[in-house]
Amino acid sequence: MPSFDIVSEVDLQEARNAVDNASREVESRFDFRNVEASFELNDARKTIKVLSESDFQVNQLLDILRAKLLKRGIEGSSLDVPENIVHSGKTWFVEAKLKQGIESATQKKIVKMIKDSKLKVQAQIQGDEIRVTGKSRDDLQAVMAMVRGGDLGQPFQFKNFRD
């Protein structure tokens, strides 16, 4: 019986490469000359800290980071940026989290969306991923298209496709 897993993962090595590329761009840009601006990737907590001297520059740095992440194959929706920018001393910073795994509320939405589609497939929640099984490959591919097309605020990957 064909099956596949729906997961949401971010490759930390690609994220590190994107952060390094963004840091290089900031060093060479004229509008960031003589400005304390940096990116810091924390592998353990899966966060990226964006630091600068003003809140406007933090927003510019976030735009640069999103562009570099997209070039490295990481969607911008996988970056969870809080609304408030923290001011500490003479610096402003924001700590953005990289979304890893699918939250239970999103999992339930996906399973409900699959069941409402009336396709002959079964969806099971397994930890932070969803296993979808069905008799027809076409039904599974229709589920993939539906999950990609659904606006769930998070990028999804499909792994372990078995016939």
UniProtKB/Swiss-Prot annotation:
CDD domains: YajQ_like
GO molecular function, one term: nucleotide binding
Keyword set, alphabetical order: Nucleotide-binding
Protein's UniProt keywords contain Nucleotide-binding: yes
Keyword Mitochondrion: no
Pfam families the record matches: DUF520
Recorded GO CC terms: cytosol
Protein family (similarity comment): Belongs to the YajQ family.
Role: Nucleotide-binding protein.
Protein's recorded name: Nucleotide-binding protein YajQ
Source organism of this protein record: Shigella dysenteriae serotype 1 (strain Sd197)
Protein encoded by which gene: yajQ
